């Protein structure tokens, strides 16, 4: 088993099941906090035709997400989903706090070739990320912050078009 911190579409157990072919809700430990990073849409996914989430170092910020305790058999399918083999994302091992406990050597994924500016998410990706955040019980204030960030990026994109 390995610990995995999800902060984007993988927060949604339903969407994760779509690619891992297994119900993952049973592996949810709870919502967790990753300190020293912030969220950003610094990758364009051709498959999703959307800006997709990344975490970038930022000493003054934190990211809330979902901590999973997954069986090893899901490691390779998760890497495939995150495009590791083609250089989309890479593993990063981090420390997160969940239910008052510190978890070390937790796998998360970070974008390899980051865009210089954030790219807005599609409506579909927007909804999957929010559904995961709400389903897994992330704090309401964080869900609203996530909603507002994604919505502002979409508004900026519409104005630029």
What do the predicted segments below correspond to?
Residues 1-161:
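Glycine-aromatic micro-motifs
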């Amino acid at each position: 088993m390995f610990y995995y911190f999800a902060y984007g579409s993988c927060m949604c157990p339903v969407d994760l099941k779509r690619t891992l072919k297994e119900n993952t809700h049973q592996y949810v430990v709870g919502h967790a906090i990753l300190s020293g990073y912030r969220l950003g849409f610094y990758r364009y996914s051709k498959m999703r035709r959307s800006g997709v989430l990344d975490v970038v170092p930022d000493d003054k910020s934190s990211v809330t997400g979902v901590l999973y305790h997954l069986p090893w058999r899901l490691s390779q399918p998760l890497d495939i989903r995150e495009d590791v083999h083609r250089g989309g994302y890479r593993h990063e091992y981090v420390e997160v706090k969940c239910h008052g406990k510190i978890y070390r050597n937790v796998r998360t994924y970070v974008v390899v070739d980051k865009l210089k500016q954030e790219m807005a998410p599609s409506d579909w990706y927007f909804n999957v990320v929010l559904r995961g955040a709400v389903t897994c019980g992330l704090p309401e204030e964080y869900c609203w912050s996530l909603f507002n960030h994604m919505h502002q990026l979409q508004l900026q994109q519409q104005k630029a078009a």
